[in-house]
């Protein structure tokens, strides 16, 4: 999916497979656009979700998620949870390290909250 200015949007799944999550994200985006008075916009094929960072399953920690939590906290003062934002940031870091983005390109990581999740998964951090 691309924002109105053409910037790509990449989702990182925390459960399910890529196709399932892409369909869900497309439905939710279409409904959001409808509520904003922008109905009849076809989003099929425009949602890009990666499922490489799900690991052993929903709310199951991964080594890359643990690394992402540590790096975000240490270098940015950013608190991530082990269920959603930790895995999402692990994906974000992986994409950046792989050279997927131009070094001059501005990037945005959308932190969706989840701090209370830290308290439910002390063994994950």
Where are these regions (language model features)?
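Active-site-adjacent helical/loop segments in soluble small-molecule enzymes
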Residues: 43-103
């Amino acid at each position: 999916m691309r924002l109105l200015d053409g910037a790509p949007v990449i989702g990182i799944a925390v459960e399910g497979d890529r196709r399932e999550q892409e369909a869900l994200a497309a439905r939710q985006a279409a409904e959001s656009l409808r509520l904003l008075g922008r109905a009849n916009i076809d989003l099929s094929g425009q949602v890009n979700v990666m499922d490489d960072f799900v690991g052993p399953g929903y709310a199951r920690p991964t080594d890359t998620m643990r690394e992402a939590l540590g790096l975000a906290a240490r270098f940015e003062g950013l608190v991530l949870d082990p269920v959603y934002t930790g895995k999402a940031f692990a994906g974000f870091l992986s994409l950046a390290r792989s050279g997927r983005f131009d070094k001059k390109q501005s990037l945005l990581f959308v932190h969706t909250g989840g701090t209370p999740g830290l308290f439910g998964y002390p063994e994950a951090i």
